[in-house]
Regions:
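Membrane-embedded helical hairpins/re-entrant loop segments and their flanking transmembrane helices
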Residues: 63-87, 247-262
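Transmembrane helix-loop-helix hairpins in multi-pass inner-membrane proteins
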Residues: 1-41, 85-197, 280-357
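Short helix-coil transition sites and intra-membrane helix breaks within transmembrane domains
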Residues: 59-65, 71-74, 93-102, 272-285
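Alpha-helical segments in transporter systems
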Residues: 12-15, 54-58, 126, 224-236
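Hydrophobic/aromatic residues in alpha-helical transmembrane segments
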Residues: 26, 64-69, 104, 240-247, ...
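Helix-boundary and loop/linker segments of multi-pass membrane transporters
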Residues: 9, 39-47, 75-79, 111-112, ...
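Alpha-helical transmembrane segments and their immediate interhelical loop/hinge regions
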Residues: 204-257
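Membrane-interfacial helix-loop connectors
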Residues: 77, 248-308
Length: 357
C-alpha cells in the first residue's frame, strides 16, 4: 500500500511539477534569446488570409488522419465516430501529452466493444506510420538540400536516418507477425510453457498478443489497401506541412519545401518526448531550433510562425474535442481521469462492430 501511494505521489510530482517546469524553462530560454517586442510586432502584422488558410489545412489534416485510422480499423465503425474519438484524443493530449493514446482505445472499447489491446494496437500502428512517414519525407528533404549545396545539421540528419531506419524495421517485423498470427501465438505459447508461470497468466499473455495482432490486421489486406494506407500516411503529413507553410507565409516567410518538411519532422518527433500540457514552450523551442538550424530566419519571424501554428492547433483541437464530448457521450472529467481507471480487460478477438447504447 505504501509503495502504491509513493508511486502515485511521484506521478503527481512528475505531471504537475516537472512537466510544467519544462515548459516554463523553454519559454524562459526563448524570451532571453529573441526580442519579445519584435515577436509581438510580427504577430500583430500576421496576414489573416494566410492564418485562415493554415487553419483550413489543419482541419483537412485532422479529417484525413481520422480517415486513415478508419482504414486501419477495417472500416467497421462509422467514420464520424472515428473522427470524434480522434478529436478527443487530441484534446486529452493537450491536457496531458500521451493521454490521447490511451483515450482512443478506451473510447473504442466503451462505444464499440473493441478489445482494449486491439484498439491500442491500431493506435500504436498509427504512431508508427506517423514516424515512418515523417522520417522518410524528412530524409528525402535532407538529401534534396544536400544536392542543392545547403548544409544540413548533423543532428537533424541523424534523427531522420535513425527514425526512418528504426520504423521501417519495426513495420517489416509487424507486417510479418500480422501475416503469421497463429504461428506467432503458438511460438509464444511454447516459450511460456518453459517459464515458471501459471497457466492462466500464460494464456492471458497469448490472448493479449492475439488482440494486438488483430489490431494490425490491415497489414494482411490487399495490395490496393496497403497502397492506400501508406499513401494516406504521406498525404497526411504533406497536408500538415502545407499548414506549417501557410503559417510561415502569414508572417512573411517563404521556406523551401525541403526546409519546411525537414523542420516539421524534428518538431513532430519531439512530441514523443516528455512535454508540458499542450506542448506549450517545447513546441516553439524545437520549432525555432530546427528551422534556424536549417538556415531559416530571422528568428523573430520563425518564432512568430511557431506561435501562429501552435495557436491554431490548440484552438482547433480544443474546439473539435469539446464537440466530440457531445458526440461520443463522454464527459471531460471521465476523459481526463482516464489514468485512474482500472486496468481494462484484454480480450482476444477481432475489431467487432457491436455498438453499446
Amino acid at each position: 500500500m505504501a509503495d502504491t501511494h509513493l508511486g502515485a505521489s511521484r506521478q503527481r510530482v512528475w505531471r504537475y511539477g516537472v512537466l510544467p517546469l519544462i515548459g516554463v524553462v523553454a519559454i524562459a530560454i526563448l524570451v532571453l534569446r529573441v526580442d519579445v517586442g519584435s515577436i509581438l510586432s510580427e504577430l500583430r502584422g500576421a496576414e489573416p488570409t494566410w492564418v485562415l488558410a493554415s487553419a483550413a489545412a489543419l482541419t483537412v489534416f485532422y479529417l484525413v488522419r481520422a480517415a486513415r485510422w478508419h482504414l486501419i480499423l477495417g472500416r467497421r465503425h462509422p467514420y464520424t465516430l472515428v473522427f470524434w474519438i480522434s478529436s478527443l484524443g487530441y484534446l486529452a493530449n493537450n491536457a496531458a501529452p500521451g493521454l490521447g493514446e490511451l483515450a482512443k482505445p478506451w473510447l473504442l472499447r466503451r462505444r464499440r466493444s473493441v478489445p482494449f489491446a486491439a484498439g491500442m494496437s491500431t493506435v500504436m500502428l498509427e504512431r508508427l506510420l506517423d514516424f515512418w512517414g515523417l522520417a522518410t519525407i524528412g530524409l528525402v528533404s535532407f538529401v534534396v538540400l544536400a544536392v542543392q549545396g545547403s548544409s544540413v545539421p548533423g543532428w537533424l540528419l541523424g534523427v531522420g536516418a535513425g527514425v526512418a531506419g528504426a520504423t521501417t524495421l519495426i513495420l517489416i517485423a509487424t507486417f510479418v507477425a500480422a501475416r503469421n498470427t497463429d504461428s506467432v501465438v503458438s511460438w509464444i505459447r511454447r516459450v511460456l510453457k518453459r517459464l515458471p508461470l501459471s497457466p492462466r497468466l500464460a494464456e492471458r499473455v497469448c490472448d493479449v498478443t492475439d488482440s494486438l495482432l488483430a489490431g494490425a490486421a490491415i497489414l494482411r489486406s490487399s495490395l490496393p489497401t496497403q497502397i492506400a494506407l501508406f499513401g494516406s500516411t504521406w498525404a497526411t503529413w504533406l497536408i500538415n506541412a502545407l499548414a506549417a507553410y501557410l503559417a510561415f507565409r502569414a508572417v512573411g516567410l517563404d521556406p523551401e519545401p525541403a526546409v519546411l518538411v525537414g523542420g516539421l519532422m524534428a518538431v513532430a518527433v519531439s512530441q514523443g518526448l516528455p512535454a508540458p500540457p499542450g506542448y506549450i514552450g517545447t513546441y516553439q523551442a524545437v520549432w525555432l531550433l530546427a528551422y534556424s538550424g536549417l538556415g531559416l530566419g530571422p528568428e523573430e519571424k520563425v518564432l512568430a510562425a511557431a506561435i501562429v501554428s501552435h495557436g491554431l492547433i490548440l484552438i482547433l483541437t480544443v474546439t473539435y474535442g469539446f464537440l466530440g464530448l457531445q458526440s461520443v457521450l463522454v464527459s471531460a472529467r471521465e476523459l481526463l481521469s482516464l489514468r485512474k481507471e482500472p486496468r481494462p480487460a484484454f480480450a482476444p478477438a477481432g475489431l467487432t462492430s457491436k455498438e453499446k447504447p
